[in-house]
């Protein structure tokens, strides 16, 4: 998973394609499974490129936390860099719409998602509410 924030302090969310088996039509951050031989970081960067057409500068990426599940785990990354919706291209099989939202809108969205663990929701909310040091480096 990778949380993408632009220099206007807006977060990119994507609406999952209605043809997806899992959570069709749901709004979410960019996420996906890693391919064989990939690290979670490389997988997150690849998913951002494939699903929304953004090349995320590796220097802009920070690891946030790992959400451990019984049979898998989700590594959560954050990246802040200059981008706009005009620069995005949707992968039609995965994404049907894109939006930019505020930190509070993103928190509200994540809190509503029943497939997210309480640990995930708490960690993400804490990060979003206390990310000033990350924003400072992004805006330089």
Model-identified regions with their sequence ranges:
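Short, solvent-exposed aromatic-acidic interface loops
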Residues: 16-20, 94-97
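Recognition helices and adjacent regulatory flanks at domain boundaries
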Residues: 20, 46-50, 77
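Histidine- and/or cysteine-centered catalytic micro-motif in compact active-site loops
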Residues: 7, 16-18, 32, 66
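A basic- and aromatic-enriched beta-loop-alpha substructure that forms the phosphate/nucleotide-
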Residues: 18-28
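Conserved N-terminal beta-strand and adjoining loop/helix that marks the start
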Residues: 1-11
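Nudix hydrolase/Nudix homology domain
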Residues: 25, 63-140
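The catalytic Nudix box helix
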Residues: 13, 29-62
């Amino acid at each position: 998973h990778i949380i993408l924030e632009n220099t206007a302090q807006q977060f990119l969310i994507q609406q999952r394609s209605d043809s997806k088996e899992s959570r069709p039509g749901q709004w979410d951050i960019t996420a996906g499974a890693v391919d064989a031989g990939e690290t979670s970081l490389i997988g997150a960067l690849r998913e951002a490129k494939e699903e929304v057409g953004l090349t995320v500068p590796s220097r802009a990426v920070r690891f946030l936390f790992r959400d451990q599940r019984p049979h898998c785990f989700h590594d959560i990354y954050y990246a802040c860099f200059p981008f706009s919706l005009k620069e995005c291209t949707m992968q039609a099989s995965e994404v049907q719409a894109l939006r930019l939202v505020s930190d509070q809108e993103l928190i509200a969205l994540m809190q509503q998602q029943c497939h997210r663990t309480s640990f995930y929701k708490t960690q993400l909310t804490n990060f979003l509410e206390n990310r000033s040091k990350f924003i400072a480096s992004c805006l330089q």
